[in-house]
């Protein structure tokens, strides 16, 4: 690397690195986990009661949970079922 990254660039690279690791984990789960396990992953997140959960006070965490649900559902939705 020719130039050091600034703080924002480092943060973005951290996020991208996490996304890549998550994609690899989801790919493995897609192969080894039964459908029930994959459904439970998103249902656990969907069942968070944001009226009492501390994440409700933090819009970044709340949005991250919403994105996690969407990613899990998108990853494991068969192509014919996607909208």
Curated annotation (Swiss-Prot):
It holds the Pfam family DUF2766. InterPro entries: Uncharacterised_YecJ (IPR020262). This is Uncharacterized protein YecJ. It comes from Escherichia coli (strain K12).
């Amino acid at each position: 690397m020719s130039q050091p990254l600034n703080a924002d660039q480092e943060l973005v690279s951290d996020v991208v690195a996490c996304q890549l690791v998550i994609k690899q984990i989801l790919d493995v789960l897609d192969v080894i986990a039964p459908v029930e396990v994959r459904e439970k992953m998103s249902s656990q997140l969907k069942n968070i009661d944001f009226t009492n959960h501390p994440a409700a006070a933090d819009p970044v965490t709340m949005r991250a949970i919403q994105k996690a649900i969407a990613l899990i559902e998108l990853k494991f939705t068969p192509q014919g079922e996607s909208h």
